[in-house]
Design a protein with these regions (language model features):
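C-terminal charged capping/lid subdomain of soluble metabolic enzymes
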Residues: 85-149
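Active-site segments that bind and position negatively charged phosphate/pyrophosphate groups
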Residues: 1-95
Length: 149
């Protein structure tokens, strides 16, 4: 998938439409819908989209210049770590996100990576998603360090 997706990004940048581009687009649409249905009610699966919601509410000027997927992209490394994926897998995803030009750090969203901003975002996510288990809160807090640059 990663190799085909990287090729598709390059082809689109060149203005070329190929079956690989079609396949990646349709795969992403299908996976997004499936993930949305499967994750309904799962708090661990809500971190990346929780970041989007927090940015939309707390950092409106930054939100205005970003696409939904760009903000969610920044939360993916956190999401993967919270869900227990290996460091190798997380790094592979981060490299791919960087390859396609989506943010993987707060600073790329235009948000200062300060403790105050992190605490505002975490409070919003915990409240909005209903994450009240201290162990899960701490796991999420710890893994946000991945995107605090």
């Amino acid at each position: 998938y990663f190799a085909d997706a990287a090729n598709a990004v390059l082809q689109v940048a060149d203005g070329t439409l190929t079956p690989v581009v079609d396949d990646i687009i349709f795969t992403n649409l299908a996976l997004t819908g499936l993930t949305s249905q499967l994750s309904s009610g799962s708090k661990q699966l809500a971190v990346a989209h929780g970041l989007y919601d927090a940015v939309s509410k707390l950092f409106k000027p930054q939100r205005a210049r970003l696409l939904h997927g760009e903000i969610v992209s920044c939360g993916i490394p956190v999401q993967l770590a919270v869900n227990g994926y290996s460091e190798e897998y997380i790094e592979k995803n981060v490299r791919f996100l960087e390859l396609i030009g989506t943010p993987t750090q707060f600073s790329q969203l235009g948000i200062e990576p300060t403790e105050e901003n992190l605490e505002q975002i975490l409070a919003f996510i915990f409240d909005n998603v209903g994450i009240d288990e201290p162990a899960l809160q701490e796991k999420i807090r710890k893994n946000f360090a991945r995107v605090m640059k």
